[in-house]
């Protein structure tokens, strides 16, 4: 049961749960939605770099590097990785000259 649907009351020197039953369809639906929401939020926080990179580039791994020299490919890869690594914070510091 969810904390939102339970009421804890002292009963005979113990903490118990006074519930009307968990067979209420609205309660079951709310619990399922809550569990799904929590699961999706946790997966998003764990894998957000991979997930959003997939949205940006689709099913391919990134922009095509066909015909580009290997040194330029490596430089581009490092640049993209550093851009992803700096995206960990919510705020970006911009200094104006």
UniProtKB/Swiss-Prot annotation:
<dbReference type="GO" id="GO:0005216">
    <property type="term" value="F:monoatomic ion channel activity"/>
</dbReference>
<feature type="lipid moiety-binding region" description="S-palmitoyl cysteine; by host">
    <location>
        <position position="50"/>
    </location>
</feature>
<comment type="similarity">
    <text>Belongs to the influenza viruses matrix protein M2 family.</text>
</comment>
<dbReference type="GO" id="GO:0140321">
    <property type="term" value="P:symbiont-mediated suppression of host autophagy"/>
</dbReference>
<protein>
    <recommendedName>
        <fullName>Matrix protein 2</fullName>
    </recommendedName>
</protein>
<feature type="topological domain" description="Virion surface">
    <location>
        <begin position="1"/>
        <end position="22"/>
    </location>
</feature>
<keyword id="KW-1043">Host membrane</keyword>
<feature type="topological domain" description="Intravirion">
    <location>
        <begin position="44"/>
        <end position="97"/>
    </location>
</feature>
<keyword id="KW-0812">Transmembrane</keyword>
<keyword id="KW-0406">Ion transport</keyword>
<keyword id="KW-0407">Ion channel</keyword>
<feature type="modified residue" description="Phosphoserine; by host">
    <location>
        <position position="93"/>
    </location>
</feature>
<keyword id="KW-1015">Disulfide bond</keyword>
<keyword id="KW-0375">Hydrogen ion transport</keyword>
<keyword id="KW-1133">Transmembrane helix</keyword>
<dbReference type="GO" id="GO:0016020">
    <property type="term" value="C:membrane"/>
</dbReference>
<keyword id="KW-0597">Phosphoprotein</keyword>
<dbReference type="Pfam" id="PF00599">
    <property type="entry name" value="Flu_M2"/>
</dbReference>
<feature type="modified residue" description="Phosphoserine; by host">
    <location>
        <position position="64"/>
    </location>
</feature>
<feature type="glycosylation site" description="N-linked (GlcNAc...) asparagine; by host">
    <location>
        <position position="20"/>
    </location>
</feature>
<dbReference type="GO" id="GO:0015078">
    <property type="term" value="F:proton transmembrane transporter activity"/>
</dbReference>
<keyword id="KW-0325">Glycoprotein</keyword>
<keyword id="KW-1032">Host cell membrane</keyword>
<feature type="region of interest" description="Disordered">
    <location>
        <begin position="59"/>
        <end position="97"/>
    </location>
</feature>
<comment type="function">
    <text>Forms a proton-selective ion channel that is necessary for the efficient release of the viral genome during virus entry. After attaching to the cell surface, the virion enters the cell by endocytosis. Acidification of the endosome triggers M2 ion channel activity.</text>
</comment>
<feature type="transmembrane region" description="Helical; Signal-anchor for type III membrane protein">
    <location>
        <begin position="23"/>
        <end position="43"/>
    </location>
</feature>
<keyword id="KW-0945">Host-virus interaction</keyword>
<keyword id="KW-0946">Virion</keyword>
<dbReference type="GO" id="GO:0044694">
    <property type="term" value="P:symbiont genome entry into host cell via pore formation in plasma membrane"/>
</dbReference>
<keyword id="KW-0813">Transport</keyword>
<keyword id="KW-1083">Inhibition of host autophagy by virus</keyword>
<keyword id="KW-0449">Lipoprotein</keyword>
<feature type="site" description="Essential for channel activity, possibly by being protonated during channel activation, and by forming the channel gate and the selective filter">
    <location>
        <position position="37"/>
    </location>
</feature>
<keyword id="KW-0735">Signal-anchor</keyword>
<dbReference type="GO" id="GO:0055036">
    <property type="term" value="C:virion membrane"/>
</dbReference>
<keyword id="KW-1182">Viral ion channel</keyword>
<comment type="subunit">
    <text>Homotetramer; composed of two disulfide-linked dimers held together by non-covalent interactions. May interact with matrix protein 1.</text>
</comment>
<dbReference type="InterPro" id="IPR002089">
    <property type="entry name" value="Flu_M2"/>
</dbReference>
<keyword id="KW-0564">Palmitate</keyword>
<dbReference type="GO" id="GO:0020002">
    <property type="term" value="C:host cell plasma membrane"/>
</dbReference>
<feature type="site" description="Seems to be involved in pH gating">
    <location>
        <position position="41"/>
    </location>
</feature>
<keyword id="KW-0472">Membrane</keyword>
């Amino acid at each position: 049961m969810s904390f939102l649907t339970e009421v804890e009351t002292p009963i005979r020197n113990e903490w118990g749960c006074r519930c009307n039953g968990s067979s209420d369809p609205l309660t079951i639906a709310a619990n399922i939605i809550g569990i799904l929401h929590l699961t999706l939020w946790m997966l998003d926080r764990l894998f957000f770099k991979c997930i959003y990179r997939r949205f940006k580039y689709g099913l391919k791994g990134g922009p095509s590097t066909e015909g580009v020299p290997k040194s330029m490919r490596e430089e581009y890869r490092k640049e993209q990785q550093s851009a992803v690594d700096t995206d960990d914070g919510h705020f970006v510091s911009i200094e104006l000259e």
